[in-house]
Regions:
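Surface-exposed interaction regions that form or flank ligand-binding interfaces
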Residues: 1-68, 75-80, 91, 106-194
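Short, well-ordered alpha-helical microsegments
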Residues: 67-70, 85
Length: 194
């Protein structure tokens, strides 16, 4: 009986470290994948950050308390501007107000109108900031990155070409009630959501 127990102990002693090493490597790989997905790719507005007007700060992604996320938020003297991207033209189509996107199985499925979604996200962010700030209202602008010649704007949302983002932000009027201290406070509130 003792040789069998000794052989079993030796087998465990030889295989357990290798098994734990394999499990550890698999967990590290999973964590790296989750971190890469959470970080995401560089967004168009983030790539233009150096060209933005003075005083503008880009927050690449924020998570609203209701679980929704907004990909690009720019805070500056104008208040807050959010940017969302249109789906690729080759994989999307519009029929009136209805938008559809083609999936890898070549079927077309309806999606939410990106312009209306951006306008609603801006309104959600505005309500969140209003709940946090009692003494002033922060102006929140919504824009969708795309070709203004092919997609018309809707109420509450503009269509801006990616190369025109710095000029569009520079054209927004400064919000008079947004003092440097208030602007810093809004930046802190949004950084907490990042």
């Amino acid at each position: 009986m003792a040789p069998v127990i000794g052989a079993a102990a030796l087998a465990v002693a030889l295989t357990a470290p290798a098994a734990f090493a394999i499990v550890g490597i698999a967990r590290l790989g999973g964590a790296a994948t989750r971190a890469r997905v959470a970080r995401g790719s560089t967004t168009p507005v983030t790539r233009k950050a150096a060209q933005l007007p003075e005083g503008c700060t880009v927050i690449p992604r924020i998570w609203l308390p209701d679980g929704r996320w907004i990909p690009d938020v720019v805070v500056g003297p104008h208040g807050v501007a959010i940017f969302e991207s249109l789906p690729p033209a080759a994989a999307s189509r519009r029929t009136g107000d209805r938008w559809e996107v083609r999936f890898s199985d070549q079927t077309w499925r309806p999606i939410e109108n990106p312009l209306q979604k951006a306008a609603r996200d801006a309104d959600r962010l505005r309500r969140h900031l209003d709940a946090q700030e009692r003494d002033f209202v922060v102006r929140v602008q919504a824009a969708v990155l795309g070709d203004p010649g092919t997609v018309g704007r809707v109420d509450g949302c503009s269509v801006v070409a990616p190369d025109d983002v710095p000029a569009w932000l520079a054209a927004l009027p400064a919000q008079r009630g947004l003092s440097p201290d208030r602007l810093a406070h809004v930046r802190e509130l949004l950084a907490d959501l990042a």
